[in-house]
Amino acid sequence: AGFNTVRMSWVNATLPQDLERFDPVVEAAARHGVKIILANHTNEPGHGPQDNWGAQQKNGLWYDLGGASDGTDGGGNRGTTTDARFLEDWVTVARHYAGTDTVIGFDLRNEPLAIRGGSTWGTGDPKTDIRLMYERVGNAILAVNPQVLIIAEGPQNYRGSAAGVGPAPWGDLSLAERAPVRLTVPDRLVYSVHDYPPYVSGARPAGGPAKVAAMNRTWGYLVSRGIAPVWIGEMGANFDGSYENETVAESRVWAKTLVDYLNGRLGDQGGPTFRGPEQGVSTNWWLWGYRPGEQLVGTLDATGALRPAQLAVYRQLRQHA
């Protein structure tokens, strides 16, 4: 088991410090042939239980000052990032890493939320339509760094979906065919979703035909019909029942269904299929490492060894030809 790409997150309010942290990592990655994807995680630092430790920005938007924002990030922090600053910060990042082939992708916003007052898709409202943000920011990035991939996450939608085809807790891309992200440079767009078992996501069923049908409707059709690539920007599970309310059986069902789907084994249920050396749907495991006291989904134990349950799932992924 191994990996060839690392996803690292940054915050608008701490961008200068984040770039200082990233630079030596990018240099080390270049020496080892590992690629980097940078993701904007939240606008503000300083998270706690009130906003699930910053797992997502609770106002559901990509900015927290002006526009549709109430002047906070929705999690108790005063807002400092306007829509304009959000774009400017991404252009700063793009310029900083222009000319290196190690930083290959920019994940424009981590886990936007399709909550009331949060992100929408295809509404045409520049204050909330995240598709329009992806176009504005993506094209501004490509103007200074045309080689990089622009990664556009579907808003996590627990209530329904933009196309009215059922909830999309992993990310709602149900309108991405009818209302696509339009970039000025071809072949640079990658859509993305995040998928976790119920003890993390709260989404049920964990797997099986109903889960497959929901994925087909909300993002899988993009791959099945060759419309656009989709990347699973985060996935992972603990598999031992030691964290929060994990049910190990549910996590195993989740993993079986998702891995089969990503590998093209569920074509008889409408999922993507792949032939011969074709690559399956690419993924990013959260997290590759060990955090003392926070072994939510990490792949390593305290000794640095791969945890068997994670390895058993990870090694099945059809990640390369």
What residue ranges belong to the model's regions?
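Non-catalytic accessory regions flanking glycosidase/transglycosidase catalytic cores in CAZymes
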Residues: 1-5, 20, 31, 35, ...
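Catalytic domains of carbohydrate-active enzymes, especially glycoside hydrolases
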Residues: 1-11, 37, 217-225, 275-282
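An active-site-proximal structural segment forming one wall of the substrate-binding cleft
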Residues: 1-6, 10, 14-108, 129-142
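Generic structural signal for helix capping and beta-alpha/helix-loop junctions
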Residues: 15, 46, 158-160, 239-240, ...
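Conserved Rossmann-like nucleotide-binding pocket used by diverse enzymes
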Residues: 36, 231, 284
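Short acidic/His/Gly/Ser-rich catalytic and metal-binding motifs that mark active-site loops
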Residues: 44-56, 115-117, 200-201, 293-294
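Extracellular glycoside hydrolase catalytic/binding regions
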Residues: 87-91, 95-105, 109-279, 301, ...
